[in-house]
Amino acid sequence: MTPAAGLGLKPQHYDEALAATAPGLWFEVHPENYMSAGGPRLTVLTAIRTRHPLSLHGVGLSLAADADPDPEHLQALKTLVDRFEPFVVSEHLAWSTHRGLHQPDLLPFPRTHAALSRIAGNIGRMQDALGRQVLVENP
């Protein structure tokens, strides 16, 4: 099936997503909501994936932070990518961590050569960890 129209998947829409039959329909999910060893969310996502393509769109990797991406986050993301085989993996280009503290927001980054170099390195580390190209979205 060629993906044609996508919807953001939220738990309150699970029943409709499971019943949907439109050709070309795909769903975008935030991988951070599915980074667990099991549970009902993964069960439902597995059922949806048997019927529709998925896109994983991350919001928590903090690619513009002043540190490398969290290796545990990258490993959890890799586990989801391997399990669900999304046709697209993307991540927000922002920062949300600083000195080990997590901010519950996508914060802007300075538009400097140093920031660009750091971001390019972090995108490279993400792609290397996942073994595939990724898309980035500016907040």
Model-predicted segments: where are they?
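Acidic-and-aromatic substrate-binding clefts and catalytic sites of carbohydrate-active enzymes
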Residues: 14-15, 31-43, 62-72
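Active-site mouth loops of central-metabolism enzymes
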Residues: 3-12, 61-68, 108-114
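Structured, acidic catalytic/metal-binding patches in enzyme active sites
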Residues: 51, 58-69, 84, 93
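Acidic (Asp/Glu)-rich catalytic clusters
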Residues: 16-22, 39-56, 72-87, 124-129
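N-terminal ordered "arm"
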Residues: 6-36
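Active-site acidic/histidine proton-transfer and metal-coordination neighborhood
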Residues: 70-139
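Hydrophobic faces of well-ordered beta-strands that scaffold small-molecule active sites
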Residues: 3-9, 25-29, 54-57, 89-91, ...
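Active-site beta-loop-alpha junctions enriched in small/polar residues
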Residues: 10-12, 30-34, 59-62, 93-94, ...
